[in-house]
Amino acid sequence: MDELTPRQAHILKTLIEEYIESAEPIGSETLEKKYNLGVSPATIRNEMSQLTKIGYLKQLHASAGRIPTARAFRFYIGQLMEERQLPVTEEAKARQTVEDANQSVDSLMREATHSLAETTHALSLGTVAGEDTVWHAGYSKILDMPEFYNIDVAAHVLSLIEEVKRVRELFFERAVDDPVSILFGEELGWPYFEPVGMVTAKFMIGGPDGRMACIGIIGPARLPYSQVIPIVRYYGGLIADVTRNV
C-alpha cells in the first residue's frame, strides 16, 4: 500500500473524509475525539507529522491543523475510497434528460451539463471537438463553498466558461484517457487554482467514428469523490450510448 503503514492509511482516510465534510484543517484532537482510531492523541500527532513529511498532508499555518495534498487525494481515490453508485432512480432521470435533448449537439450538451450540475452540486462544463462552445451550468453552486470565497479563485475558475481553448487543454490534453480523469489545481500550476479539483469523462459523440467530447465538474479539491466519480463516469457513458446511432 504505497509506503504507508496500515495505521497511517487509516488515519489519512479518516482525515480526508473529515476534511471533505468540514472544509477545515484537521487537527489530531478532532480525529481523537470524533473517531475511535484506537491510538493515543500523541500517536495520531506523530503519524500526521510523518504524513506531512512524506507529502500527504500540508499545514497552511503554524497553529492550524493539516489538509490533504493532491498526492493524498490520489492515494485515497485509488486505494482507500469506496465508490457510491448513483441510485437507479437518478440514473433513469439522467437518461430521460439526455434522450429528450438528443436533437442537436447544443441541446444535448446544454441539458447534460445542467443535469450533471444539479446532481453533483458543482460547476459542470462540457466541450465537443469542432464546436466553439463551452457548455456550462451550476456556477452559482461553487460560490457557496469556502474555497471560492476568495474572489481571485472564484474569478479564475469562472473565467473558464469563456475560454474554449483552455477548457480543451484541460479536458482533452491534461486529462488522461481513462473513462474518468481526476485533475487537481495544485498540479496544474495555474494561478489561483490550488484549492480546485476536477473530475472529467471523455467519450465519443456519434459512435466510434464520431467526435471526441468531454464533460466534467469543477469544485473544491475536497470534492466528495466517492459520489461524483461514478456520476461523471455515468454521464460520459450515457451521452456516448445515446448518440451512438446518431
Residue ranges and their predicted role:
Residues 11, 69, 217:
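Conserved RecA-like P-loop NTPase ATPase core
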Residues 4, 24, 146:
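Residue-level marker of regulatory loop/turn positions in helix-turn-helix DNA-binding domains and
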Residues 14-21, 25-80:
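N-terminal helix-turn-helix
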Residues 81-83, 87-246:
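Intrinsically disordered, acidic Ser/Thr/Pro-rich low-complexity regulatory segments
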Residues 3-4, 39, 68, 86:
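Alpha-helical hairpin
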Residues 1-13:
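Short alpha-helical segments that sit at the start of domains
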